[in-house]
């Protein structure tokens, strides 16, 4: 089941639990706007290259639409649509005043020079600048993009609309980015993990963690878990996977990754098959890479974790979700567990609009407040509807968006 089918399935299950009427259900499911643009740029060698860009603006009942822009060869309309819809429910679960959007360009960033990436970003911005804005749609970084990408979008957008730092988030701090934004998704995943473990009478200290993905999210999660006394026993990235039953020295691993650009070859751990990372023995499994990685095939290989924290978007296939739940594995869903990034993006947007910057402690303290409150809200919905955490999160998000839609008179 692809990401769009799985997301639609979860939405429809939540709508059924909430008793939404069919007209309202349909209006919440269909995107507000789908944008497809062609972007042609001159390459460094003088030839022309053409790329296709997408932006799906799913819903704006609760505020400006919000979501990342990813650069990846496999970007397609269905994936962008699914991720835009997930952003709608995610911002509602976090209770921040946004709707959902997502964008992307089908390209391989590693095959393009810095100047080619800049030209591509500026052309894409030229094509969509009238459809984004501070109070309309606020992009952010995603897979294959970074603060520099956001700086280019800000600059190009400002040529048409005047200097507008709040038009994108995840910017460099020197251009109005927020302190703490780089660690926000990983830190949010830590706070989510703490909330779940506390519910079960446990703490991060002493738990054994396996983390799939050592990019921005996975590496920060590993660092913060290590600082809290958790034992990270295995990690993986695109270069390979490593394991140390006694716990990996995360600070040393950070230095190794900085020098070699991957976890492969780290001296204080032994290599393992990257395909087996999800079934390594641990207490807590954190998928922090691509979607769809936990599926029924993993079940056949016997996932051993007691808890799964979805730091990636849509990492668990619905069939695997059902099987694991029956086995007693507790899954903390992506639309709550990885909402730290968009929450701190909201803080950045607020700071830009106010023209008043927060210190990092305030950012982190506010993030913890939002994540702790979000877990309580999800649990309350679980009790109300007698459902698991995923459906608790979906019913929470869908209900908040549905209420805003009805209050604005859009349901007819």
Swiss-Prot record:
**What organism, scientifically named, is this protein from?**
Solanum lycopersicum (Tomato)
Enzyme Commission (EC) number = 1.4.1.3
What broad class of enzyme is this? oxidoreductase
Q: Quick one: a GO cellular component term?
A: mitochondrion
Any one biological process term the GO annotation gives: glutamate catabolic process
Q: Where is the active site?
A: 102
> Its encoding gene is what?
GDH1
At the top level, the lineage of the source is Eukaryota
Q: Where is it expressed, tissue-wise?
A: In roots, stems, leaves and flowers but not in fruits.
Q: Which family does it belong to?
A: Belongs to the Glu/Leu/Phe/Val dehydrogenases family.
Q: Name one Pfam family in it.
A: ELFV_dehydrog_N
Gene3D superfamilies reported in the protein's UniProt record: Leucine Dehydrogenase, chain A, domain 1, NAD(P)-binding Rossmann-like Domain
InterPro entries documented for this protein: Aminoacid_DH-like_N_sf, Glu/Leu/Phe/Val/Trp_DH, Glu/Leu/Phe/Val/Trp_DH_C, Glu/Leu/Phe/Val/Trp_DH_dimer, Glu/Leu/Phe/Val_DH_AS, Glu_DH, NAD(P)-bd_dom_sf, NAD_bind_Glu_DH
Ranked from the top, the taxonomy reads:
Eukaryota, Viridiplantae, Streptophyta, Embryophyta, Tracheophyta
Q: Which SUPFAM superfamilies match?
A: Aminoacid dehydrogenase-like, N-terminal domain (SSF53223), NAD(P)-binding Rossmann-fold domains (SSF51735)
Q: What is this enzyme's catalytic activity, as reactions?
A: L-glutamate + NAD(+) + H2O = 2-oxoglutarate + NH4(+) + NADH + H(+); L-glutamate + NADP(+) + H2O = 2-oxoglutarate + NH4(+) + NADPH + H(+)
Protein name as catalogued:
Glutamate dehydrogenase
Alphabetized UniProt keyword annotations: Mitochondrion, NAD, Oxidoreductase
Q: Molecular function terms in GO for this entry?
A: glutamate dehydrogenase (NAD+) activity; glutamate dehydrogenase (NADP+) activity
Could you tell me where this protein is found in the cell? Mitochondrion matrix
Instruction: Tell whether Aminoacyl-tRNA synthetase is among the UniProt keywords.
Output: no
- Record keyword Mitochondrion present: yes
